[in-house]
């Protein structure tokens, strides 16, 4: 009875005012919560961006190329991790790798493509599109031969940019070289792209 009498004493407009106040408080709480989530996500993205920039800057120095925002960052980051790995015939790991093993590992990681086990087969079986030397793009496979006829492929690498490519040298392991060097100009045979390569 006391509760009923108390409610009778409260004017009707007080309930409307109270309801309006609670609505404003609820709106304010939702706004604060949304801002907190947005700030948290923005901070996380900012930290991730800084980390990416640092990793790309390191990869750029290691590969000797300038990496732009439009480049395939995953390609350059992956290749940078292989520089300095020792040569090992038939190897397919960072403990040791040969030229076709290097292209196999990088393509499998980046494109989910399993290339053939040697450079000759990669050109004959895996390449779907031949590319002229002046039109190579980052990620294209490059093929070389030390034979006079150049019919037998015995070396393969991956093009980066600016004339640079990554490959596994028998004497110096995984390294970066320039296509304009006389040695590589003499050995050049072809370039190509596989069906699984994405830009």
Where in the sequence are the language-model features?
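Post-signal-peptide N-terminal segment of Sec-exported extracytoplasmic proteins
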Residues: 48, 54-95
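Catalytic cysteine-centered active-site loop
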Residues: 62-66, 85-138, 189
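Aromatic- and glycine-rich peptidoglycan recognition patches
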Residues: 42-51, 56-67, 130-133, 152-199
